Amino acid sequence: MTDAARPVFSPKHLLSRFRSYGTSLFAASCALVAGCVSSSGCEARYDASPQFKGCGFQNLPNPEVLPSASAWRIWSRFIVGSKVDTVPVDPIPVQMLSTADLDALDPKANHVVRLGHSSHLLKLQGKYWLIDPVFSERASPFSFAGPKRFHKPPLTLEQLPPIEGLILSHDHYDHLDVATIEYLAQRVQRYFVPLGVRARLLGMGVPADRVTELDWWQGGEHNGVKLTATPAQHFSGRTLTDRDRTLWASWVVQSGDQRIFYSGDSGYFPGFKQIGERFGGFDLALMENGAYDAYWPAVHMTPEQSVQAFEDLRGKVLYSVHNTTFDLAFHTWHDPLDRIANLSQARKIELATPVIGEVLTVGKARTNVRWWEGLK
């Protein structure tokens, strides 16, 4: 090990590690294993759901899934392990957006705007939707600690247009942001969430009559847009005592004659092929591609697995998400993009790795640019 890569065990170093990762990542690592979680206080029950067992939700059977490391090993690694090139030195490029930019988008088409990480603004036949919006500085329960953004969003919460619908994949802090939801609470016409997440939103000020809560394979419709909650292989929880009390999901969005898939967070599992078979393929697939590690192989896909899942889904365009905004793992900040770009080129897959703030029009040809190359 070189001196540059050798862990430093000073109080200042440990405090820095805690501020960067401690609060949210300790909760996440504990949630990976049942041993960290109390089984008491099962207030909400969803016995009608095939996914609900005992006092929580579970994944579909997957005999090929690899086990995760213990919570202690994960936590120890975040505290004293070596992290190299996980945070960019150079600024991440951002294309700032204005209301005029959004208004100029063809109201008859479907558009996807990259806000960062897994957050996206959609313009579906003239109406605006949000997916997993996170506008806060940190993906954490605290403003002073936890993973910090690499870049600003391309527009502010105050600049958002009227939002017709909002889709949530699960309740982790990098997908369900309290400050964002509290601001949007009365400004969104309809929320679509997995089972159990409704209660989270009500606690953030969202009106009860605006929330549609769905199990896997259940669907809903709002002003011409059809949505279906589909399976994912992940977990949920926001504290050390609420493991899997809410469901996690991927989503199918149908607008006009086009279908968009959003993976949410997921490990690789046979469900992707089932989703592809049931819906007959997708015009665009937003696929998780980041935060993977050999310590937690069941809950996040490697780039190779993301490509395989995309092929299982019968997608036309692979859109890479869940990267280049937060430092959530041990791979370099650019590794997800490097690997998926090379894999897609080798397998002749049409790839989309848009710059933050870039607009992708579904079904419209575009030239993909490796914008991250050359950045440190």
Where are the predicted features?
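Active-site metal-binding loops of divalent metal-dependent hydrolases
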Residues: P133-F135, D171, A232-Q233, G264-S266, ...
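Divalent metal-coordination and catalytic microenvironments
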Residues: L122, D132, H170, L227, ...
